[in-house]
């Protein structure tokens, strides 16, 4: 596709089966309540398998033992992954202690997984523990509503502990946007919290009776940090401040990274700039973008249903004009903004409020007690004495925020005692990330979380060998092309193709504003490391001052930049 072809506003044709499922679900109830009482299987069946996603859960099984159980004529060991709704990633120490205990007592793996969407997941909840899990969240003032499926997911907000006043304002907007776009159905409260069924008819004034065509992701971003990776998201509010006070947002729409191997009608896409709005129009614009996508998104093909494809089909200006019409608001010209990076500042920083903030590097976001490194216990011990809050970051790390000077030494001592602070962690490790993948993700094609630590060790060796031990490459591994690991915004991105094999993408940048192009297809880790060694060798010798690896491979002609991904993402580049 070399030209822009505006298409119809609404795609006609046979609706996908997901649309049938939603329309017949009675506003997301299905027969989940009845299925809960079916002790003959450890899983949810039929439509309920997908409907539980609207309630924040995915049905999974342990793929390490799937074949063994099949030989024994047993069904897979079904267990649920439950994802909390936590706009902006802020959680109190008291809430943390509650989830820490639940993970230990009621999950197969005993871990808490911080995700790159600023929340946490429990993995391995057996069917009998699912309802208690939701009830626990409710007791803690939390929920899992709308953290999966065709709704607005967990709203991200830049974790900026230094500009505390600005962060607080941005965080409040993340919460407001999340609440405004939530499903209104009482199904969640009825099924999980035993809320009384009332005779009123459910209505979904924003999402509609069949909800959105596909998942929808929203961020609130405070430049110059792009830690939330705005270009992976459908709707982005980029903070504009005046004298340290939030005055409005630049709005960017239509980002997204998921693709399908072998289907060139799918592609990653950066978000498009729509314009600037003052704060008072934020919720109206959020609602208008969502309802436009609700009505115009492709409901016949789920692989082409996301906002990014709607924008390409109808045209950015047409979509933008419809948003303005529905919101009764005109966008002003974009205000200047710039991103300089997206990594977390590991260690202590002092905020303008004179409080201290400690960012702990949590490799892969997995909190568990390992031999010699009791990470999960360490965070719980800090929670017992911490007077501020915890902030989960989009880089899967944890910030102990709002520490007064008098508590600083004690919290650092606990962090060091439990292996949560390690002065030997390299910049490379801190800038590497993977999705969960095997053994729990049903979509996994290749290892990611379990693969990353040793792979990073080998990359560290390459950097050291070329005299770049203090440097880093933004490295991401995602176990399948759905892209949860956000590899398609990395300088070096690995996308799982098959067990032990990945597509290697090069040429993103450190700021997360360029999509990397595929350099080699379906290759092994050893082959990737060989290529990395050769290219890092050139980078060490030929780089400009402060030139990142991704910028270097573009400038050196190793790979051509992706300029317009809907048209050039799959262009074959001859390797140099």
From Swiss-Prot:
Pathway connected to this protein: Sulfur metabolism; hydrogen sulfide biosynthesis; hydrogen sulfide from sulfite (NADPH route): step 1/1
MF (Gene Ontology): 4 iron, 4 sulfur cluster binding; heme binding; metal ion binding; NADP binding; sulfite reductase (ferredoxin) activity; sulfite reductase (NADPH) activity
Keyword match Heme: yes
Record's keyword terms, sorted: 4Fe-4S, Amino-acid biosynthesis, Cysteine biosynthesis, Heme, Iron, Iron-sulfur, Metal-binding, NADP, Oxidoreductase
Enzyme class of the recorded protein, top EC level: oxidoreductase
CC per GO annotation: sulfite reductase complex (NADPH)
InterPro entries named among the record's database cross-references: CysI, NiRdtase/SiRdtase_haem-b_fer, Nit/Sulf_reduc_fer-like_dom_sf, NO2/SO3_Rdtase_4Fe4S_dom, NO2/SO3_Rdtase_4Fe4S_prot, NO2/SO3_Rdtase_4Fe4S_sf, NO2/SO3_Rdtase_FeS/sirohaem_BS
Cofactor(s) required, per the database record: siroheme; [4Fe-4S] cluster
Pfam families in alphabetical order: NIR_SIR, NIR_SIR_ferr
Binding site for [4Fe-4S] cluster: 435, 441, 480, 484
Residue numbers binding siroheme: 484
E.C. no: 1.8.1.2
Record's catalysed reaction(s): hydrogen sulfide + 3 NADP(+) + 3 H2O = sulfite + 3 NADPH + 4 H(+)
BP GO terms, sorted: cysteine biosynthetic process; hydrogen sulfide biosynthetic process; sulfate assimilation
Keyword field contains Iron-sulfur: yes
Free-text remark on how the cofactor is bound: Binds 1 siroheme per subunit. Binds 1 [4Fe-4S] cluster per subunit.
Gene3D superfamilies linked to this entry: Sulfite Reductase Hemoprotein, domain 1 (3.30.413.10)
NCBIfam families: CysI (TIGR02041), PRK13504.1 (NF010029)
Family assignment from sequence similarity: Belongs to the nitrite and sulfite reductase 4Fe-4S domain family.
Subunit record text: Alpha(8)-beta(8). The alpha component is a flavoprotein, the beta component is a hemoprotein.
Functional description taken from the UniProt entry: Component of the sulfite reductase complex that catalyzes the 6-electron reduction of sulfite to sulfide. This is one of several activities required for the biosynthesis of L-cysteine from sulfate.
Name used for this protein in its record: Sulfite reductase [NADPH] hemoprotein beta-component
UniProt organism field: Yersinia pseudotuberculosis serotype IB (strain PB1/+)
